[in-house]
Amino acid sequence: MPLQSSRLAVDNGTPVRGKPWPVWPQPTDGTLDALSRVLRSGRWAISGPYRGVESAERRFARRFADYHRIAHCVPASSGTASLMLALEACGVGAGDEVILPGVTWVASASTVVGVNAVPVFADIDPDTLCLDPDAVEAAITPATKAIVVVHLYAAVADLTRLKEVADRHGIVLIEDCAQAHGAEFEGHKVGTFGAVGTFSMQQSKVLTSGEGGAAITADPVLARRMEHLRADGRCYRDQAPPSGHMELVETGELMGSNRCISEFQAAVLTEQLGELDRFNALRRHNAELLDALLTDVGYRPQRSTPGTTARTYYTYVAELPDAELPGADITKVTEALTAELGFPVAPAYSPLNANPLYDPASRSRFALGPQHEKLIDPARFVLPVSGRLTRRLVTFHHAALLGDESDMRDIAEAFTKVLQHRAVLAA
């Protein structure tokens, strides 16, 4: 790979890349027809009148469950909503402690305080950036009700050990798979190892309808509870109603709220699901090429837990070389890479004990008394691995992995060029 000697693009030099990159989302050939069918159907929501045919929402739920070889799928309005459904369906509530990783998207924690429970942040594994089982074990108390394991960026967490810890202590294990659609561990899809697996279908995700989510489970009781929780306390009838009547029935079993997706979203998701494996395979192939190129010049790509049989690349992540960039300002590095490549390169998520997006004290709804406020104060947690690593990680969105080998070489060339100019990137 030729080394660049020109000035950095951020310093008025010539960028490595001038061509456009692949965009995301990418609609399938059948998406417009699927949306048109919903538009003409007379039913745009699950609360709309039954028209004698399977709804788009039920069709997607059935196919997503089949994809995971699991019995039940409950679609929802977002990944956040799906995680809240899972927590409440599993009985997590006021005063319960929920262990989750110190580095993840803020919703993994905000959903916990949203059900009046207490997030407990545990540190991460330095290789996978996922929840460290030893840190989880150390964080368990008599108040621990659940563990939320997040499969972060492009890694699968250590499900063998985390499931063993959860089972041994009688704690519910919930998988947050918002960034891991289609990933596999020991030949099984993620989301099928815990009591519930939750997914996000937001714009940036590898399976998307702009906004949306889903929860999967093998447990019919949990599935029925989640149906009630997402549809204002209603669930599907056992038998189809007469045409023109609503499929949902009021049972009085469990109060819920409206967290449903529309028929339009479900139609898009069904189309996208048919392309998920193809896109995932392309990203995986290109990520493996890039791993080799970046490793050659000293970067350290994110790893996945041994036993991972299929990775899903939501975000590509690499750690800066210690020798060449020991004291680099991560913001300067990501700005330099962005200027070279023409797409956003960003630092990793800030640890949740110091993340400006996670501030329960800014919401009066969480002011439930001095003791509760003390428990949900994120500053009480010490996360040394999270703090150290997030100052050394660069990340970019999976859309760039939808190109070809020459695109991966452009990315590697930009990363190499930045190394050449390390003196100007020091903190």
Curated annotation (Swiss-Prot):
Region called Disordered, residue ranges: 1-20
E.C. no: 2.6.1.100, 2.6.1.101
Database matches in InterPro entries: DegT/StrS_aminotransferase, PyrdxlP-dep_Trfase, PyrdxlP-dep_Trfase_major, PyrdxlP-dep_Trfase_small
Catalysis: reaction(s): 2-deoxy-L-scyllo-inosose + L-glutamine = 2-deoxy-scyllo-inosamine + 2-oxoglutaramate; 3-amino-2,3-dideoxy-scyllo-inosose + L-glutamine = 2-deoxystreptamine + 2-oxoglutaramate
Cofactor section: pyridoxal 5'-phosphate
GO MF: pyridoxal phosphate binding; transaminase activity
GO BP terms: antibiotic biosynthetic process; polysaccharide biosynthetic process
Pfam families for this protein: DegT_DnrJ_EryC1
Keywords, in A-Z order: Aminotransferase, Antibiotic biosynthesis, Pyridoxal phosphate, Transferase
Signal sequence extent: none
Keyword field contains Transferase: yes
The protein's annotated pathway: Metabolic intermediate biosynthesis; 2-deoxystreptamine biosynthesis; 2-deoxystreptamine from D-glucose 6-phosphate: step 2/4; Antibiotic biosynthesis; kanamycin biosynthesis
Residues modified to N6-(pyridoxal phosphate)lysine: 205
Function text: Catalyzes the PLP-dependent transamination of 2-deoxy-scyllo-inosose (2-DOI) to form 2-deoxy-scyllo-inosamine (2-DOIA) using L-glutamine as the amino donor. Also catalyzes the transamination of 3-amino-2,3-dideoxy-scyllo-inosose (keto-2-DOIA) into 2-deoxystreptamine (2-DOS).
PANTHER family named in the record: DTDP-4-AMINO-4,6-DIDEOXYGALACTOSE TRANSAMINASE, TRANSAMINASE
Similarity annotation: Belongs to the DegT/DnrJ/EryC1 family. L-glutamine:2-deoxy-scyllo-inosose/scyllo-inosose aminotransferase subfamily.
Protein's UniProt name: L-glutamine:2-deoxy-scyllo-inosose aminotransferase
Organism field: Streptomyces kanamyceticus
